[in-house]
């Protein structure tokens, strides 16, 4: 959000809980995508960008996953995106050039153990990205960001010791873990007019792990 605010934009954020801190350019709406309906009257008539970034990591062996886990990930990662986008699409269409950004995972392209639930739902989201990019062109751009592991509170249990951080970094050709700022900068670029010739892309930001092998 701070990257977007640095460009003097007004940001409308939604989450199940409140937003930490205050800023006159942020309008927060309490919204649980799984149970609530987003009231379009709370939104501006024109929206220039939509970023859908739910937070969840269900990494477990396939044999221990219940069917409900797959349904839950699909509801949050795919159906929630569709539901929200259907509500705000008329406002995105009012913009002369708007941008939609979804978030996937490097595990869709690479294939990683214990990622079967999240990868299933995120791969569907990547398909949605390409389909909507074709349908909404040329007025609305649609792209998807697919990161590897990023040092955020959501990933804390995987990166809560120096040994875990070093081992995770070593799996990446660039020998480092991604940061929230790096993901935010790519997001800001895809929202900006500077990326107006980019649509229908799944962009890996993953330290090279999805395409390069150095060992």
Which residue ranges define each predicted feature?
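Substrate-binding pocket helix/loop in short-chain dehydrogenase/reductase
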Residues: 61-62, 69-74, 168
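Active-site loop-to-helix junction immediately N-terminal to the catalytic Tyr of the SDR YXXXK motif
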Residues: 65, 111-119, 131
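Active-site helix of classical SDR
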Residues: 85, 121, 129
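Alpha-helical segment proximal to the catalytic Tyr-Lys
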Residues: 90, 133-138, 196
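Residue(s) in the substrate-gating loop at a strand-loop-helix junction
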Residues: 105
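Short, flexible catalytic-loop segment of classical short-chain dehydrogenase/reductase
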Residues: 146-157
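Short C-terminal tail/terminal secondary-structure segment
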Residues: 188, 199-215
């Amino acid at each position: 959000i701070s990257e977007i605010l640095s460009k003097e934009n007004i940001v409308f954020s939604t989450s199940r809980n409140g937003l930490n801190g205050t800023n006159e350019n942020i309008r927060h709406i309490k919204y649980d995508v799984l149970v609530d309906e987003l009231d379009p009257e709370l939104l501006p008539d024109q929206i220039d960008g939509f970023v859908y970034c739910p937070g969840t990591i269900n990494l477990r062996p396939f044999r221990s996953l219940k069917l409900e886990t797959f349904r839950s990930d699909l509801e949050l990662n795919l159906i929630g995106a569709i539901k929200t986008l259907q509500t705000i699409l008329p406002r995105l269409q009012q913009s002369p050039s708007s941008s939609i950004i979804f978030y996937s995972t490097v595990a869709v392209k690479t294939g990683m153990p214990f990622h079967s639930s999240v990868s299933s739902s995120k791969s569907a989201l990547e398909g949605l990205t390409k389909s909507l990019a074709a349908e909404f062109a040329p007025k609305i751009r649609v792209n998807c960001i697919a990161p590897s592991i990023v040092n955020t509170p959501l990933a804390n249990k995987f990166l809560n010791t120096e040994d875990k951080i070093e081992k995770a970094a070593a799996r990446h050709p660039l020998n480092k873990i991604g940061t929230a700022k790096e993901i935010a900068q790519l997001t800001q670029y895809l929202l900006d007019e500077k990326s107006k010739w980019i649509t229908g892309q799944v962009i890996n930001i993953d330290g090279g792990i999805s395409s390069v092998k150095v060992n």
